[in-house]
């Protein structure tokens, strides 16, 4: 695990509420080269009244405009993240319709020129979406490749951290015993290794590695191996 990732996890481990957590997100976004960030999450623990959290440091005028015009219904990042876990790079240049173009041009007038968005969700149905934005420069393909791992790691870590705060889940309710093989697979996953690479390192088949990772994901109540590694670290299991 890189020192950047370790520092991020350490910071999230000591936050006590959503506001403290978002301060860490803002600081991290700045280090990644973004002026603005936003995180939204909906918890399904109450079917009648699902809890929704919206945190951002966008200009106040844009926040007001966004709410008044109900832009959540036309915001392409929201529409994308409702149906996909894949990251989306956005700007007015990527607009597919005139409505989208108008939306992005207005956002640009408030300093939101280009950005990156990705959703996340877990097994209990908590959905989250992280957006990073800035007022200058396009996101080049080179920058996207260089920063992808960091931005993906931030998305998963934020979701795991804030879901724990909002849902107030006692993790002791779940089966948190991990076998040595499961821990080993998660440690190497945290180092950025693929299942095939882990298989070579520990001397088992790729299928066996995936078996251990799937078991870990179920025990830790997450839906991907990166989230499993993050949660295991945060819970002191590795």
From Swiss-Prot:
Keywords: Activator, DNA-binding, Quorum sensing, Transcription, Transcription regulation
Induction or repression: Expression is decreased by virstatin.
Species this chain originates from: Acinetobacter nosocomialis
Mutant phenotype after disruption: Deletion mutant exhibits deficiency in biofilm formation and motility.
Protein name per the record: Transcriptional activator protein AnoR
GO biological process, one term: regulation of DNA-templated transcription
Keyword Transcription regulation: yes
Annotated gene: anoR
Single Gene Ontology MF annotation: DNA binding
Record InterPro entries: Sig_transdc_resp-reg_C-effctor (IPR016032), TF_LuxR_autoind-bd_dom (IPR005143), TF_LuxR_autoind-bd_dom_sf (IPR036693), Tscrpt_reg_LuxR_C (IPR000792), WH-like_DNA-bd_sf (IPR036388)
The keyword Transcription belongs to this UniProt entry's keyword annotation: yes
DNA-binding region (UniProt annotation): 195-214
